[in-house]
């Protein structure tokens, strides 16, 4: 089902499709891409492939993973951008100007999972860059928890560590999943 959200024109997963499965490029909601959700879906697919042995899905999953990592990565400032418009238009509420903790977590898991399954060094390099960005900009060195988001340039916008969406989930899962993958890679 996740592949149904992949827009073949862009080679990435979008947040929404129309009821008929087509993509609405005429509205901001229809053009929305969330690299964090897409990459979370991709590492779920890799877990499924690993446990089921259905390797037929691997090539497509790896292609979508690398496309999304390249698309979501901020080439100027580093980190995974939280939301993007597939046509490059501004999003409502300047959401593309944030980098939140959980897309970094999901992207790191996806990149490391893809490296494990493919041995493609590009995935390992993405993991290293995402991991370094997250630990540098999102971690509170004084009180061990991560801030919920930073601005596009990595500057902290507030000191919140919890919110309606930020709780004790993505960060521990990221740490545990990456440790698990690293143990398998030893």
Task: List PLM regions with ranges.
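Glycan-recognition and catalytic cores of secretory/periplasmic carbohydrate-active enzymes
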Residues: 1-186
């Amino acid at each position: 089902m996740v592949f149904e959200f992949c827009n073949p024109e862009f080679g990435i997963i979008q947040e929404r499709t129309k009821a008929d499965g087509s993509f609405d490029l005429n509205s901001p909601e229809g053009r929305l891409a969330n690299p964090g959700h897409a990459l979370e879906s991709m590492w779920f697919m890799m877990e499924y492939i690993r446990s089921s042995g259905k390797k037929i899905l691997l090539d497509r999953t790896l292609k979508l993973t690398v496309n999304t990592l390249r698309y979501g990565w901020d080439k100027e400032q580093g980190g995974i951008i939280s939301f993007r418009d597939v046509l490059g238009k501004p999003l409502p509420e300047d959401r593309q100007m944030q980098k939140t903790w959980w897309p970094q977590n999901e992207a790191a898991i996806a990149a490391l999972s893809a490296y494990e399954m493919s041995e493609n060094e590009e995935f390992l390099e993405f993991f290293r860059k995402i991991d370094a960005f997250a630990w540098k900009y999102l971690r509170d060195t004084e009180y061990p928890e991560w801030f919920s988001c930073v601005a596009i340039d990595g500057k902290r916008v507030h000191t919140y560590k919890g919110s309606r969406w930020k709780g004790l989930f993505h960060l521990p899962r990221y740490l545990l999943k990456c440790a698990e993958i690293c143990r398998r890679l030893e």
